[in-house]
Amino acid sequence: IILAGILACMSMGAQAQNAKVEEPKGKAIVQVFGNFSTGFGAENSSRGFELERSYLGYEYKLGNGLSVKSVLDMGKSSDVSDNNRLAYVKNAMISWKKGNMTLNGGLISTTQFNFQEKFWGYRYIMKDFQDMYKFGSSADLGISVAYKFADWITADAIIVNGEGYKKIQKNDG
């Protein structure tokens, strides 16, 4: 019995040495958009700090190219006073990446907004024109596929219901 116990302890030590340290598969998503303003001259007493919008979420890699992502969008609505905030589910999606191809399904980010935001790149100065003038929604219910041919050329296609993430269709038709 003692010999069996010693052999078991030795084999556990060997397994512990061979075990790889597993990297974290998930990551938190935290983005906060705010403004600070102050007046000059006659408007010098006009100062303010404002939290426009926050994104809180989590992304987890399941393995074999599969990942899931969920993001809450919290911000103010034009329908209520400035002190109230509303929360929406912006993303609830599953993705599969194989080589240079990516498939997304669920409540996904729309591809035209990703392209425009990367092109503009100065969200801290001003919203991009699609967001400013409400040319579509930044997320919607549907599927998308993207393929990267090279670093300088990609193609994508998206099929969505067109209602955005704030007005999810609840019934048929």
Feature roles, as predicted:
Residues E163-G173:
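Surface-exposed beta-loop-beta
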Residues M12-Q15, S78-D79, Y165:
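A short hydrophobic/aromatic micro-motif that marks alpha-helical segments and, especially, helix-coil
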